[in-house]
Amino acid sequence: MASSVDGGDSYAAIGEIGAPSPMGRLVTALEIGCDDRWDRRSFEVMLDGDAMLLESRSETAVLAGANLATVGGEIVQFAQAELVAPGKYRLSNLLRGRRGSIAATHPPGARFVLLDPLRLLAVDLPGELLGRALRFRAVGAGDAATPAVGLTLAGEALRPFAPVFLRVVSAGGDARFTWRRRSRSGFGWLDGTDAPLGELREAYRVTLSSGGTVRREVSVDAPFWDYPAAARAVDGIAPGATVTLRVAQIGDMTGPGIRASATFILN
């Protein structure tokens, strides 16, 4: 593999990959599901070549990290891979929304790529390349020239995950919104401790909307936001109003991360 930071005038080697990852496109839709729970539904994928193979693994192996794939931007795992036609598989017993991604609906034609660690190349690029247009190309043994693919680094692997467990408690017109952050530095459940921060400081961007209009946007440095009755009156949020809260943790290098949202009726 080689990359170019000067529009393709020159390329530098960045590493080697032994074999291509199985990839293809969805034949049937993958409907929205629940994050981090077993989904017993299935979807079908057509791989780009008959020589590409998928295999079933036990649920224990899947929980340990096997059969990880990206489907339209969501990270999915599957336990069962049934060959139903040449190059066509039915995948079932799914884990959705893995590695901080969001379980969403993906239509037929969405891209599928198996994330096999032995067939991936992780490249550690300097932060100053964020937002820059780079070019990459794969060069096989004996290849004289190969096409390049352009990519602008958006820093998705650096953005903080969306918070979870958005809640509100209201009394006497005052409201307190709370949430729980997640961390790229560790996403497992640990007894007696919180997830590591993963950033130099803890900060969040909070947006409150009602009726399709943003009523208030604030930044806070703790996983809660107090919304007093006086502020509600200024914003025109009457008792019984429906509001949408959006929260994103602020990253050191990328700014606001992936947003979480929830809708509430305020007393």
Where on the chain are the PLM-derived regions?
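Interface-prone segments of viral and bacterial extracellular assemblies
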Residues: M1-N267
